[in-house]
Amino acid sequence: MKDLLNLLKNQGQVEEFDAIRIGLASPEMIRSWSFGEVKKPETINYRTFKPERDGLFCAKIFGPVKDYECLCGKYKRLKHRGVICEKCGVEVALAKVRRERMAHIELASPVAHIWFLKSLPSRIGLLMDMTLRDIERVLYFESYVVIDPGMTTLEKGQLLNDEQYFEALEEFGDDFDARMGAEAVRELLHAIDLEHEIGRLREEIPQTNSETKIKKLSKRLKLMEAFQGSGNLPEWMVLTVLPVLPPDLRPLVPLDGGRFATSDLNDLYRRVINRNNRLKRLLDLSAPDIIVRNEKRMLQEAVDALLDNGRRGRAITGSNKRPLKSLADMIKGKQGRFRQNLLGKRVDYSGRSVITVGPTLRLHQCGLPKKMALELFKPFIFGKLEMRGLATTIKAAKKMVERELPEVWDVLAEVIREHPVLLNRAPTLHRLGIQAFEPVLIEGKAIQLHPLVCAAYNADFDGDQMAVHVPLTLEAQLEARALMMSTNNILSPANGEPIIVPSQDVVLGLYYMTREAINAKGEGRVFADLQEVDRVFRAGEAALHAKVKVRINETVNDRDGGSVTNTRIVDTTVGRALLYQVVPKGLSYDVVNLPMKKKAISKLINQCYRVVGLKETVIFADQLMYTGFAYSTISGVSIGVNDFVIPDEKAQIIGAATDEVKEIESQYASGLVTQGEKYNKVIDLWSKANDEVSKAMMANLSKEKVIDRHGVEVDQESFNSMYMMADSGARGSAAQIRQLAGMRGLMAKPDGSIIETPITANFREGLSVLQYFISTHGARKGLADTALKTANSGYLTRRLVDVAQDLVVTEVDCGTEHGLLMTPHIEGGDVVEPLGERVLGRVIARDVFKPGTEEIIVPAGTLVDEKWVEFIELNSIDEVIVRSPISCETRYGICAKCYGRDLARGHQVNIGEAVGVIAAQSIGEPGTQLTMRTFHIGGAASRTSAADSVQVKNGGTVRLHNLKHVERVDGHLVAVSRSGELAIADDYGRERERYKLPYGAVISVKEGDKVDAGAIVAKWDPHTHPIVTEMKGTVTYVGMEEGITIKRQTDELTGMTNIEVLDAKDRPAAGKDIRPAVKMVDDNGKDLLLPGTDVIAQYFLPANALVGVADGAKIAIGDVIARIPQETSKTRDITGGLPRVADLFEARRPKEASILAEVSGTIAFGKETKGKRRLVITPNDGSDPYEELIPKWRHLNVFEGEQVNRGEVISDGPSDPHDILRLLGVSALAKYIVNEIQDVYRLQGVKINDKHIETILRQMLRKVEIAESGDSSFIKGDQMELTHVLVENERLGAEDKFVSKFTRVLLGITKASLSTESFISAASFQETTRVLTEAAVTGKRDYLRGLKENVVVGRLIPAGTGLAYHSERKRRRDADKPLRVSASEVEAALTEALNSSGN
């Protein structure tokens, strides 16, 4: 027995390891793995089913088929363990060894490994400096390659075809060596002297000038250094020995009827063995060259197919025309080893069933069917039955359970007590898709789910199914209870708002309960306390909606933990007083003294959580739910056709619109308007009519007439069922009601254009056949869109998770002072997101001063909570620098201070939180709600007149931001910069709105002026671009000759003459190179200089400019010299929704991106080329001018002689994130990407915290490009990990050497995932072959830092509770203790870590 125990112990021994290295296998290594050579292609004997000797399933090589029994049956039983049978040669062992023991095949001729040959860039090609095409010609026996030229005129590596080879033979005889096939390639690889080559390349690179050549050489150099550093030899890329997979991993299973099911690999191996044996025989017989060659080529092809079928030529197919699955196919793709078996395993102790609603459950409970519980908890029940002595053996216990004896149910109830189970609903889009509950046994077969967690699961009860999992170990139960219990997940990790929010019936009930009605029974009564209200209501003396006065005692908690009790009389309704009974102590009565709509309820729960804490909130949420259900039942709200009240005005509105349409039609018929104008007008008309109808309808629905208690008829908010549902937020919206009771409105064709005739009917009236047909388009497109959207959104989430999976909080504070400047987010002049909301839950990076003083009011390092937000708003601070994941300086991972608040818990984030995955889930989860389509700006939207003025919405004080301006004689300011902005601040100094001011805008207010709402503070002409003078003087024309460079036009209406500059291509030959300009001179005729420079003040005029001043005219500061007409902006498609988010995260360069100034300086135009303009920027510091060629059709925002700053827009268009990063830096990039992504989500009403987007951005900015290598081993132009470069630079700095210089690089998420340090993570993401090839050649080490790598190797992940385990293991290793870590030690370490992080 003791022997057996020892044996079992030995089986499970696993060496502890800290990294995994991948490399090339040498022939010796392959032979050392092997237990024998496979010589025959036979598999098993088809009569006896015994494996053939020396075949692919040979028991002598791979081990016995049955446990502890040799093949011939001479030795059986455990006592013969390790004996080798002398008859059949089989070792007596466990049959499991057939999964582990490998064999090999000695190849008669070397074979190139297809991965290193064909996976681009071809590694063999790079090393030998030959093209892939040439190598293939050698490998597949089409040409000879010279290996050793000897004393001849041939060169090493030269290709010879048959004729050339025979000519050379005749000429030189045996003086040279030229061969073909893989052995030739192997010889050449073997002959490479890595050290010598590396030295040669390092010398050659600095001496070459051509960019492409340097690129090629540095690629070779990198590969050679990789080979040198990894200990791989180049010739190992050519195989001489082929390893054979253990037979149980490629099984052969007999089916009934004498047929066999087999793995494809067996076919591929058989093919290789057959060809190899045939080749050996041919070589022994010394057959003619041509036959041997053919056989070698076939062997090469067979091995290619085994390693990666279909990579070269046509894939080898089986009997059923299906390509065979090769070794490479086994590991890649969704069904491959990585994604199917290592990252996604099926688990034991789980079940699934349909869900149904459990309105009587508490929040931490779920209803589990008895039958399911019995099956899931079987082992626990067996154990308990045996422990109780109710069953003598496990077998007896099993029988008892099968018979379902009464005592079994008692035991089950006991086993289940306090044993949480996990409920999961697919698709699990975020971490709230799996939560823990305490099971309650129920009859029936459906799982009961608490209604409030439906929002988190996105579940409904129309047939959804959910899976149940049982956490078995004590640690698992502990984590389920402490971390995953539904009561611990009240806030959403995406935005920190409650996710346990009542919806639908509950909202309706609470809304109905808190509405007020005029002249209800009991109106005007006064009650002494809440209990009295309750009694009177139950007695039926007062109606639920009656307006009454009640004396209340309330205890209000303030933010500092104190509380104030006071008594007052409030005007309220009976229902609200009843609702206040379930509100926890500490909240004021005002929270319920209003109609409880969905938003109000959400706010109430949030406030409750912040003020009175988790436990009270959970109890309160449950109470709210019970109350809501009760009162929505009492209310009897239901919908009948009569609730859809159609407004009386509808017929008249539609009649009027129809008449107008007829009028437009007749105009079109008589040719007064074009087809396009007619279409636009008609569509405008109908959308206006639709709005009017819906306005009338809502006005009609929302009010009803009642008699008050003085007998007067008054209006009150309606109790129409449909209106109440929409108003409370329970179900439906104004848009849907409009279709039911108003008119359906305009419909779109499948191509997105709008059909001119709207559907004037609504659903109550019913649609005609034509109307129904028109409306099917939209419905169909909607369904098709949804199907596509789900797949796209899932893929986006997968890429996000992959790029961010290894980002974990690893330390408390990285000590950086850097951060992002936060300002309110402004859109179209309005503040969409105030500063307070953006900094909530962030840590302040630098002290915040009281505006205008030196007094610090918020010290650096403060975690901003709701209390601080109010404080910041009160002190009218409008910009704060906060810590951000992007600027965090932690090496591996991120620090808690830079991340700030853990949104799902409401306090500073704990060490070990997997913030990367949370960010990915928060961004990916709402993906299915985003739209898929690109919006065409056309129809109503494109004709909105271009903005030509700034009109203030709120009154306040004017503030001008980085605005360069000149003051005109009349005191108005004229903007002479492009980046100026005008903001309006309120009395507290908080910014309320902000507007961009274009060049040439005339501003009628000054800094600090007070303005009223509605005032127009700036004006400009949107259709022309003015050239404004910045000084006074006299105008002189330069190079303006009529008929050659300019033409005069007279305006018919005004009779004024304008001078227009001719386009260069319309000028006669004499005027081609003349550049017309307007020069400023003083009264003596001397040239004036631009203020502050020594540049002559002359304004060059581009083509089509209109000059408005006469030669010799006197002008003042701020006058307009000329105007350049601007073609109205072309309508372009705006990519919205999911594709836009994907584009931003993939950092794609947009088409026709905006052009930014590369340097700060003065603009000039150089010589034009065909179709392009040459823009020259001369820097002010006297360095070399920067030139750029810009296509002529691009509209430029700048003109000659103007000053621009680095990164300013020269030509409009969508921004390119790479340009922003290069020219304006990381924080400008962060601001751009965060705002752009938020705009997309905001449009759908989805809230995501900025820090999640920043977290993903941090991962996209991991790489840097080396600009100067200094004394480091980096090569210029290399892309390296930022942390890696910083570590190296620290080392160089310490040794007083030159450090390397680098620029930051932005990678798209797919590229970033593939270029991680961990090859396991990258290989399991995409492009498995390429990643593994590269990793093997460079001998990469994976240090298992991320989550994915650890899941793949089957460890705890280094996040959450697993982080404690890993750090404890590391500490042990450093202390050289024995390496088994027990649960209790981890527990102790975890407690210590939690205490130190201040929890």
From Swiss-Prot:
InterPro entries: DNA-dir_RpoC_beta_prime, DNA-dir_RpoC_beta_prime_bact, RNA_pol_asu, RNA_pol_N, RNA_pol_Rpb1_1, RNA_pol_Rpb1_3, RNA_pol_Rpb1_3_sf, RNA_pol_Rpb1_4. Binds 1 Mg(2+) ion per subunit. Binds 2 Zn(2+) ions per subunit. Its EC number is 2.7.7.6. Zn(2+) 1 binds at C70, C72, C85, C88. Mg(2+) binds at D460, D462, D464. It comes from the Bacteria. Keywords: DNA-directed RNA polymerase, Magnesium, Metal-binding, Nucleotidyltransferase, Transcription, Transferase, Zinc. Its cofactor is Mg(2+); Zn(2+). It catalyses: RNA(n) + a ribonucleoside 5'-triphosphate = RNA(n+1) + diphosphate. One of its GO terms (cellular component) is DNA-directed RNA polymerase complex. SUPFAM superfamilies: beta and beta-prime subunits of DNA dependent RNA-polymerase. It holds the Pfam family RNA_pol_Rpb1_5. The keyword Nucleotidyltransferase applies. HAMAP family: RNApol_bact_RpoC (MF_01322). DNA-dependent RNA polymerase catalyzes the transcription of DNA into RNA using the four ribonucleoside triphosphates as substrates. This is DNA-directed RNA polymerase subunit beta'. It comes from Pseudomonas fluorescens (strain SBW25). The gene is rpoC.
